[in-house]
Amino acid sequence: MAGEKLLKGLEKFQIKSDSENKIFEKLDKYIQEIILFNSAYNLTNTSDYDEISINHILDSISAAEQIKNLAKSLSKNEIKIADIGSGGGLPGIPLAIVLPEFQFFLVERMDKRCAFLENEKAILSLDNVTVIKSEAEKIAS
């Protein structure tokens, strides 16, 4: 079954997907979008569902617990996280899905990839994501 490895990975990370947060559904949709647009936008080195699940999605969200722990030690009200050279949105989009309490800024210089990122933001209803078209060197603060 497609998605079985993704579900098992989420369980290992103790990430619960339910009808309210729809984590699995959003990650599944994102993987399908990567597969659909990969050849046009060169987003990953594979279009295999399970490979994307393990090597890209689960790898991206493996940092979620550490990010939460780091955020607790900071005295800021709002935590902002930048994904510089976001490409196809990895690790930013998977992290934004599992950490909706944080703001994510996806910085990408290529127009077509920015268009892909904006599309994913809309499709996945990621209100905590901002796409910035820029080179990393030109980003201030």
Name each region found by the language model.
Residues M1-K76, N119-V129:
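Class I SAM-dependent transferase core
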Residues I61-S141:
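Conserved SAM/SAH cofactor-binding pocket of Class I
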